Amino acid sequence: MGNWPHKHILTLSNFSIDDYESVIELTERFKSLNNAGTKKIPALQGKLITSIFFEASTRTRNSFELAAKRLSADVQSFSPSSSSLSKGETLIDTALTYAAMGSDILVIRHSSSHVPLEISKKLDASKAKTSVLNAGDGLHSHPSQGLLDLYTLIKFFSPKLLKPEILNSKKILIVGDVIHSRVARSNLWALTAFGANIILCGPPTLIPEEFTDFVSSSPPNQLRDPISSRGSITISSSLEESIKCADAVIVLRLQKERMIENLLSSIKSYSENYCLTPEKLSLNCKDIPILHPGPINRGIEISSRVVDEYPNCLINDQVSNGIPTRMALLYLLSKFNN
């Protein structure tokens, strides 16, 4: 595998098909090693990974730190409450300090959009070699989640050959609080790159019409045979109608902590219309896969029966796949200009 073309991974909007395939290939390789009992390899021995999380996280933070440790990297965690931020230091200065300490990669999560981008610009201006990996920024982007969801769906539809083009023309239903979801935005880039047709479903107040711009604004180099064109995006307010033709469903939670306006009449009404239940799934004649980036709110966007009993509920697969996916991203960043 040659050099990786990106110093930072901030969004999937600049990923080429080759970039996606590099991540998928490495993810599969690392997953196979993990499944074979090889829990640690010396790929990043001597590298320092620093996780800087300004938002609460269970899956993403632990997954990144475990991924780094499985690659034999040194890992340090940043805690805002016990840092110099409490003394007035800026986030930019904190990042520059970690770079000066020799951090090779900063894994950053922040509640505001584009904070990782601004940090990467300051690092580049200072001539630091440190890379930034966006672990989720506001409503903007969550690249690693988009990539692990992409891998999870490809693995489901093409378990042996792992062909990304299997997603071409598949109808992927994304239901829930799309307007506040950085995961949805990353999923749109990744899935439409391989020709998937996306159905965004939810109350009109939670799905902005401008999401259809994601396809038309894609980089030209994302197109490559055997995929003749990017997928489409359509918008629906009916889960019952949308699920009938879906090949897969990605459920999103209601992000009540981000709702600054009264966008819903009531949680009860939302659940009645958009909670994924066995009854709604029965409208589809196929055993379609169900994904959810977590954390889940049982009984609001997805029923416990679907989570616990539905055979193709892939939530735990997503968690498991997150580790090799993030191993792949950390490894690839280490290959930038090497």
From Swiss-Prot:
L-aspartate binds at residues 87, 182, 253. Keywords: Pyrimidine biosynthesis, Transferase. One of its GO terms (cellular component) is cytosol. The keyword Acetylation does not apply. It is an enzyme of class 2 (transferase). GO terms for biological process: 'de novo' pyrimidine nucleobase biosynthetic process; 'de novo' UMP biosynthetic process; amino acid metabolic process. It comes from the Bacteria. It catalyses: carbamoyl phosphate + L-aspartate = N-carbamoyl-L-aspartate + phosphate + H(+). Pfam families: OTCace, OTCace_N. Gene3D superfamilies: Aspartate/ornithine carbamoyltransferase (3.40.50.1370). Pathway: Pyrimidine metabolism; UMP biosynthesis via de novo pathway; (S)-dihydroorotate from bicarbonate: step 2/3. Its EC number is 2.1.3.2. Heterododecamer (2C3:3R2) of six catalytic PyrB chains organized as two trimers (C3), and six regulatory PyrI chains organized as three dimers (R2). Catalyzes the condensation of carbamoyl phosphate and aspartate to form carbamoyl aspartate and inorganic phosphate, the committed step in the de novo pyrimidine nucleotide biosynthesis pathway. This is Aspartate carbamoyltransferase catalytic subunit.
